[in-house]
């Protein structure tokens, strides 16, 4: 049994781990790196056609985004995930493929003018559809036998609809070991989702560390904080533009906006419009409403039982076409614009930033993690000017942060989840975090008596004697 850490080692995006067992190759996630050129993603150490199966923790692009490329390169195995993840990933991967095709076409036109060869997309919509055809749903709590010597179980980890921690039982040459992959550990007390479930025991644990070096601000009333931002912007005639992940964060924000509008909390602006400018978010929102209710926390279940739609509010308008999107900027009223991508590196949000960053009355509200190298991180870091679509745009708008909406547990939350194991793991491998976060969480675990390492890409774990022993 051998495990190779491929992606998200000392970085947040590009999650991918290779498990080799009894002559078969298995992947845990195949995510896309963000904040770098997509063609610079870390290659697999094995051929795609030699991968027997993939186990997907959740549908976010940094965990699932290279599955269509895997299919394009020859993978024809099964992709195991929860039913909600299967549905969301299908939507997200087709959207990602559309982006790949559009960007490749734009680069090709530019290359042709320079007398250079055309640029091929990383993958196409057909590749995304092919990958989606490989999905095999596994329900929470169901122990599934994949092959002789390999069983898995998915448990709710509270990060995204359908997100899971995955337990693996591995048997080879008479030796059985258990390894747990945390996936992205959710924050507690978030709208819509359940809190992360604990796991009883494991020999080895691979745990994320996105916020392994920091604590979230003291719990705040997120609804009140969002209300205050809306009030401040609207009172001075501005709008609130929110770059939001189309899947997960957008639905949480719609949940909060429904409550705000129902209670008429923004004084003097009861009828403010809310524009959801993301075809992906619109489709993902439909998936949310079709899922089993056990995916939702008790509060959301209660809203559903009352006959209400928990993520719809009066004044909500979907912008599906490019014309719909452009029309938003012709609406002079104070408004909310929700658009993807959440890190501002792609999608329609970039058009809205171009039209709104230079207006001092507006607020750009950051409501999620921003990786190094992304436009979202640059805005957080106080950049005074950005380049969008060939133009230099002054950053005059207020840049604000919505606290308490993180989909990731902080250092305390991560440690509490690890501490909930009834039996201490033999070794903990810390990944999915910037170097500072990885090493800080590793140090905390070591201080508390755990054996913890923060592997780099390419590092190996042998869970049984290697040929060298």
Language model features with spans:
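Hard-cation-handling environments
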Residues: 229-240, 244-367
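Pre-active-site segment of Zn-dependent metallo-hydrolases
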Residues: 9-12, 21-77, 81-133, 185-195, ...
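Cap/insert and terminal regions of metallo-dependent hydrolase folds
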Residues: 165, 186-277, 363-368, 385-451
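Acidic, Ser/Thr-rich peripheral helices and adjacent loops at domain boundaries
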Residues: 101-104, 287-308, 375-395
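Active-site metal-binding loops of divalent metal-dependent hydrolases
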Residues: 8-9, 30-32, 84, 160, ...
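Metallo-beta-lactamase
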Residues: 96-160, 292-332
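Conserved small/polar residues in nucleotide/adenosyl-binding loops
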Residues: 462-469
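Catalytic core of the metallo-beta-lactamase
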Residues: 21, 138-197
């Amino acid at each position: 049994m051998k495990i190779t850490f491929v992606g998200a080692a000392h970085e947040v995006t590009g999650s991918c781990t290779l498990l080799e067992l009894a002559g078969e190759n298995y992947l845990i996630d195949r995510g896309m790196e963000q904040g770098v050129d997509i063609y610079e993603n870390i290659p697999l150490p094995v051929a795609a056609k030699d991968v027997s199966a993939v186990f997907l923790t959740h549908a976010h692009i940094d965990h699932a985004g290279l599955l269509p490329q895997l299919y394009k390169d020859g993978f024809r195995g099964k992709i195991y995930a929860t039913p909600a993840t299967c549905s969301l990933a299908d939507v997200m991967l087709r959207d990602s493929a559309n982006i790949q095709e559009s960007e490749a076409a734009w680069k090709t036109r530019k290359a042709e003018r320079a007398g250079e060869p055309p640029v091929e997309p990383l993958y196409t919509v057909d590749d995304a559809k092919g990958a989606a055809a490989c999905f095999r749903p596994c329900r929470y709590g169901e122990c599934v036998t994949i092959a002789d010597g390999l069983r898995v179980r998915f448990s709710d980890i509270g990060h995204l609809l359908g997100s899971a921690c995955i337990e693996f039982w591995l048997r080879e040459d008479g030796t059985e070991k258990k390894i747990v992959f945390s996936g992205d550990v959710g924050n507690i007390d978030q709208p819509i989702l359940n809190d992360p479930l604990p796991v009883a025991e494991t020999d080895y644990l691979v745990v994320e560390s996105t916020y392994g070096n920091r604590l979230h601000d003291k719990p705040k009333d997120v609804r009140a904080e969002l209300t205050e931002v809306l009030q401040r912007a609207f009172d001075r005639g501005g709008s609130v533009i929110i770059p939001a992940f189309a899947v997960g964060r957008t639905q949480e924000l719609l949940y909060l906006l429904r409550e705000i509008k129902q209670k008429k909390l923004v004084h003097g602006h009861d009828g403010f419009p809310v524009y959801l400018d993301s075809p992906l978010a619109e489709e993902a929102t439909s998936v949310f409403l079709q899922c089993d209710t056990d995916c939702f926390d008790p509060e959301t279940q209660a809203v559903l039982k009352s006959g209400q739609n928990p993520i719809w509010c009066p004044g909500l308008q979907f912008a599906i076409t490019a014309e719909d999107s452009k029309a938003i900027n012709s609406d002079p009223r104070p408004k909310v614009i929700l658009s993807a991508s959440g890190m501002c590196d792609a999608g329609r949000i970039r058009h809205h930033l171009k039209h709104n960053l230079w207006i001092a009355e507006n607020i750009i509200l950051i409501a999620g993690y921003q990786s190094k190298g992304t436009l979202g991180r640059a805005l957080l870091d106080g950049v005074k000017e950005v380049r969008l679509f060939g133009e230099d745009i002054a950053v005059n708008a207020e840049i604000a942060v919505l606290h308490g909406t993180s989909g990731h547990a902080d250092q305390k939350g991560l440690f509490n989840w690890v501490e909930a194991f009834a039996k201490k793991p033999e070794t903990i491998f810390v990944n999915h975090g910037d170097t500072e976060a990885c090493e800080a969480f590793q140090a905390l675990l070591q201080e508390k008596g755990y054996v913890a390492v923060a592997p780099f890409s390419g590092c190996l774990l042998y869970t049984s004697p290697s040929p060298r022993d």
